[in-house]
């Protein structure tokens, strides 16, 4: 597939993964389709929904560039499918329920040359509080960590990096940090931006049961890090993991 650019502005592919969540998909699609950036491709990957989700996706017509509706092996398998279907130079995952922070978010990121020379460009994420207000959570500086230092909803990845380093679907809860650590270790450059990119749906997969997510993070560190980094990182995971087990979370 040929990577496309319009003038000096890169084409950006937004991938939305969904299954049996028509209301959440509607919220996300409206956010994506309202972006002011001129060259956006929209890819929806529906995991063979059994309700009205695929009907709604089809109702969007040619505003959706690629619609895949078939069974998958979980969210990260579906996200890999979205990357393979994309034709943009950059890819961002805005899954069902997530939205861009503002209509001009993509324009803010790619309206300058701040992304040049980097493989991952990321910003902050906002979460809704009990009153429904968006509270911005700052991303961390790039480093080899025991957990994500940004939310993947707030990150733009070069598509060629995602193709070379896809999500490992063996990690059903923590394939995102597994991927980020592999990118970091192969020397991919990360660029942190001082702006909110996404509003995060806190009902996502890694928020369902925290102990399961922490256990998978532990396995990622054990798999990818050497002894020194294990000694540094594992205590930061085992303490909250044991606390979650005691609390039944």
Please provide the spans of the model-predicted regions:
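Short, Lys/Arg-enriched, disordered terminal segments
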Residues: 1-10, 239-249
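Amphipathic, soluble alpha/beta structural segments
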Residues: 204-213, 243-247
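Catalytic core of nucleotide-sugar-dependent glycosyltransferases
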Residues: 208-231
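Residues that form generic nucleotide/phosphate-binding pockets
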Residues: 112, 220, 245
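A transmembrane-helix-recognition feature enriched in membrane-embedded lipid enzymes
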Residues: 226-246
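Nucleotide-sugar donor-binding/catalytic module of glycosyltransferases
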Residues: 1-209
């Amino acid at each position: 597939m040929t990577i496309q650019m319009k003038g000096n502005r890169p084409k950006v592919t937004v991938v939305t993964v969904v299954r049996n969540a028509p209301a959440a998909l509607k919220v996300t699609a409206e956010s994506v389709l309202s972006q002011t950036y001129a060259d956006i491709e929209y890819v929806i990957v529906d995991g063979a929904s059994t309700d009205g989700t695929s009907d709604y996706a089809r109702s969007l017509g040619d505003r959706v560039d690629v619609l895949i509706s078939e069974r998958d092996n979980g969210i990260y398998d579906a996200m890999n499918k979205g990357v393979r279907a994309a034709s943009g130079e950059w890819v961002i995952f805005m899954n069902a329920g997530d939205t861009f922070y503002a209509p001009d978010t993509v324009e803010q990121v790619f309206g300058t040359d701040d992304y040049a020379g980097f493989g991952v460009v990321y910003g902050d994420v906002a979460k809704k509080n009990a009153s429904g207000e968006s509270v911005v959570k700052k991303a961390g500086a790039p480093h080899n960590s025991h957990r994500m230092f940004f939310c993947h909803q707030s990150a733009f990845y070069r598509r060629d990096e995602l193709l070379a380093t896809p999500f490992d679907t063996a990690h059903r809860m923590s394939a995102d940090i597994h991927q980020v650590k592999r990118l970091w270790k192969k020397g991919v450059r990360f660029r942190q931006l001082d702006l909110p990119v996404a509003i995060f749906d806190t009902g996502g997969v890694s928020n369902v049961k925290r102990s399961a997510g922490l256990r998978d993070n532990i396995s990622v560190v054990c798999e990818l890090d050497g002894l020194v980094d294990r000694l540094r990182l594992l205590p930061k995971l085992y303490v909250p993991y044991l606390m979650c087990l005691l609390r039944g979370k």
